Amino acid sequence: MSNIVSYLFETKAIKFCEENKPFFLTSGMISPYFVNTHFLYGNEKEATEFLSYINTLLEDRVNLPKKVFDKVLVQYKNNAIFKYTIDTMIKAITDNVDVNEIDYISGGERRDWYFSNMIAYLLKKPHLTLFKDMEAFVSPYDFFSTEKITDIEGKTVLNASDLVTAASNYVRSWIPAVKNLNGKLLWTCYVVDRKQGGTEVLEKEGIKTIPLALVDNTLFEKAFELGIINQGQLEMLKGFYHDPYTAMREFLINHPEFIENALKSTDERTQKRVKLLVDGNLYNLT
């Protein structure tokens, strides 16, 4: 088991649901596990506080990159888990790409910035801070200054990211953003591949993918061996890995009380998400 996987377990960056209690996702779909890769910043508390800090900076785009960099640099020097994660990303990049061919490192709003700023610094490459509205800002590797940029004149880009699921952020924002800059997004290094089609989407776009850890049956079996999950949880996870939609649809058919209880929940987020599931008939239950 790689240290990245052990740290994913240790920091609870991968969180498994209790038996027969899958998590609601933002979309209204359900899943037996949830991934918060940014917890590799050190732990859940520090990662969550840093995300809140980033949120306070979103309206100040010119100063945001330097302020984010200052935080991650201190964390890199002081937190062994975060340092190991960044160093492992650097090794994966240098093992798979001729670094001399990379002109820019990019990172997209918001969780990519936990990783991309340090990658740029250590590789001594200028950094592109990308926003979901496709606006871009460029900084030198030491983030001494930042300015808006609209054209990188055919230069090459490697995006450093936390997680790939279906690659929706890439398709919707990061790939178009780099194209709008007249750049070429040729590589992406990310910590976790959820193995739900995103890597294939990126490869079809001509992007070389460099994941550190895969969420697959091998990882689930390791969690079982370590006593993190039980046999029932393992079977649900394996079913989900094989066919997420069918596995969760069958679960809902066999456990009608799950939706009934969610509809009675006093938690606003649960209420919102279960209504998306029911109103959208996301699992074709009616």
Question: Where do the model's predicted regions map?
Answer:
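PRPP-associated nucleotide enzymes
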Residues: 1-161, 165-286
